[in-house]
């Protein structure tokens, strides 16, 4: 891996200077294809209702689930619509879940004069023992009970349930299944190590000195300005950098200025202006050395709803001079040397975390692969564009690397699908708080963290000893 390559030439750091300095050519990318076109918005019309996206999602997912149900329960299983159900008759039904949650925030409930309720305080999770599941298809809906984990599932999930209707009018679930992983193309063999660096949550404009130091150290390592010959040789094997959202800190979101009088704000500038200038300088250093893909995130200056559109190039007058800088969507998918990457800046995973009992971000990533949908909670609890022809968040093809940004900590694992698909899941930690990035080796699909937090830890130790400022 990366650190092993660097260790082979560690002795050069303390060696006497030589007449000729070693140079290392950046490993070239043989093939690259940006496959994010489904997430690009052409015509932007918000006049449509969101019912269309649920109907389209069910229509697109139904063939996958019928096929999966027949594999799971046998080819003789009867797949029916809700309007065709008979009491006591065992069958399979495909539909979209709605999760009725008493703790789910509702603006209508909060502003209702009739109830006169105090606004509900924010929670880390909104699950409750009284939550109920309702299955909907094109015509009807029915409540579910039985062997199904209510707390784990979320609204918008399309699944197949097996059971029968009871006398109380509810559907007794005996078993259920998801569409599971989509088909996957094989990974071509690579003869050398090639790394893709995943970074998220730079948090520029937050005022943290350690975060800025770590960011500059990261840039210096990638561009070969730091370390001995071994580390510089290893850095030359980084073929691409992907920045996965939240490039700006949440402190730059100066929403209070909207409520202030004009004369109080006319001579001030938004906190994000200086942060964007800093980002432009960082991207300039990176893109002068390596291809960089920049995804927007929750706190970045672009549209809030998914799919987020690329940041506008006019914000980066310095970095956009290089063709190696690419401003992309969130979600983002691309094929790099035959390896298909798909990732988000983390909003989809964070939203599922709030409305489900799942605690681990890698578990949520795997679950979205199993249900074959990137963001099932959109548009219910996560804003998204009102699509009506197709749902672009459905997995048409299984990626080889699936990542989400801005997680509390680093994590990675490989999962397998029913048709021998292999997917590397990566939880990319928030860099501003962890000072950690991720290196994905395209040869072998392995992942390791690379941390820049040592300087901050040493400073804390000095302060504990009374030697610091």
UniProtKB/Swiss-Prot annotation:
The modification N-acetylmethionine is found at residue 1. One of its GO terms (cellular component) is delta DNA polymerase complex. CDD domains: MPP_PolD2_C. The modification Phosphoserine is found at residues 15, 257. Keywords: Acetylation, DNA damage, DNA excision, DNA repair, DNA replication, Nucleus, Phosphoprotein. InterPro entries: DNA_pol_a/d/e_bsu, DNA_pol_D_N, DNA_pol_delta/II_ssu, PolD2_C. The keyword Acetylation applies. It holds the Pfam family DNA_pol_D_N. It is found in: Nucleus. It comes from the Eukaryota. Disulfide bonds: none annotated. GO terms for biological process: DNA biosynthetic process; DNA replication; DNA strand elongation involved in DNA replication; DNA-templated DNA replication; error-prone translesion synthesis. Component of both the DNA polymerase delta and DNA polymerase zeta complexes. Component of the tetrameric DNA polymerase delta complex (Pol-delta4), which consists of POLD1/p125, POLD2/p50, POLD3/p66/p68 and POLD4/p12, with POLD1 bearing DNA polymerase and 3' to 5' proofreading exonuclease activities. Within Pol-delta4, directly interacts with POLD1, POLD3 and POLD4. Following stress caused by DNA damaging agents or by replication stress, POLD4 is degraded and Pol-delta4 is converted into a trimeric form of the complex (Pol-delta3), which consists of POLD1, POLD2 and POLD3. Accessory component of both the DNA polymerase delta complex and the DNA polymerase zeta complex. As a component of the trimeric and tetrameric DNA polymerase delta complexes (Pol-delta3 and Pol-delta4, respectively), plays a role in high fidelity genome replication, including in lagging strand synthesis, and repair. Pol-delta3 and Pol-delta4 are characterized by the absence or the presence of POLD4. They exhibit differences in catalytic activity. Most notably, Pol-delta3 shows higher proofreading activity than Pol-delta4. PANTHER family: DNA POLYMERASE DELTA SUBUNIT 2. Belongs to the DNA polymerase delta/II small subunit family. This is DNA polymerase delta subunit 2.
């Amino acid at each position: 891996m990366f650190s092993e390559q660097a260790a082979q030439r560690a002795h050069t750091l303390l060696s006497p200077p030589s007449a000729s300095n070693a140079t290392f050519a950046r490993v070239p990318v043989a093939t690259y294809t940006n496959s994010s076109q489904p997430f690009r918005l052409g015509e932007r019309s918000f006049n449509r209702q969101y019912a269309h996206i649920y109907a389209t999602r069910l229509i697109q997912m139904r063939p996958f689930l019928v096929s999966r149900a027949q594999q799971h329960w046998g080819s003789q299983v009867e797949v029916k619509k809700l309007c065709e159900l008979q009491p006591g008759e065992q069958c399979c039904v495909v539909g979209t879940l709605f999760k009725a949650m008493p703790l789910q925030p509702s603006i209508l409930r909060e502003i209702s004069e009739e109830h006169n309720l105090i606004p509900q305080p924010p929670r880390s999770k909104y699950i409750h023992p009284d939550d109920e599941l309702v299955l909907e298809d094109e015509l009807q809906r029915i409540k579910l009970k039985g062997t199904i984990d209510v707390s784990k599932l979320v609204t918008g999930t399309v699944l197949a349930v097996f059971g029968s209707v009871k006398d109380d009018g509810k559907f007794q679930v005996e078993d259920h299944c998801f569409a599971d992983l989509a088909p996957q193309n094989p990974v071509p063999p690579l003869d050398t190590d090639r790394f893709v660096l995943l970074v998220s949550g730079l948090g520029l404009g937050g005022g943290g000195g350690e975060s800025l130091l770590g960011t500059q150290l990261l840039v210096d390592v990638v561009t070969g300005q730091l370390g001995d010959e071994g580390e510089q040789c290893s850095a030359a094997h980084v073929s691409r950098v992907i920045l996965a959202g939240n490039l700006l800190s949440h402190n730059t979101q100066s929403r209070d200025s909207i409520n202030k009088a004009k004369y109080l704000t006319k001579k001030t500038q938004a906190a994000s202006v200086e942060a964007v200038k800093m980002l432009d300088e960082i991207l300039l250093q990176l893109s002068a050395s390596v291809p960089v893909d920049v995804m927007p995130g929750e706190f970045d200056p672009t549209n809030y709803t998914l799919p987020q559109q690329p940041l506008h190039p006019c914000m980066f007058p310095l970095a956009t001079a290089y063709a190696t800088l690419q401003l992309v969507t969130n979600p983002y998918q691309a094929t790099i040397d035959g390896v298909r990457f798909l990732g988000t800046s983390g909003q989809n995973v964070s939203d599922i975390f709030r409305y489900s009992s799942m605690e681990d971000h890698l578990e949520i990533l795997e679950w979205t692969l199993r249900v074959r949908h990137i963001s099932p909670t959109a548009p219910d609890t996560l804003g998204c564009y009102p699509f009506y022809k197709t749902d672009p968040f459905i997995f048409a093809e299984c990626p080889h690397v699936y990542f989400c940004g801005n997680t509390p900590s680093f994590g990675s694992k490989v999962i397998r699908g029913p048709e021998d698909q292999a997917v590397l899941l990566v939880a990319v930690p928030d860099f501003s708080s962890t000072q950690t990035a991720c290196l994905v080796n395209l040869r072998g699909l392995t992942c390791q963290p690379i941390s820049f937090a040592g300087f901050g830890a040493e400073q804390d130790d000095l302060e504990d000893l009374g030697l610091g400022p």
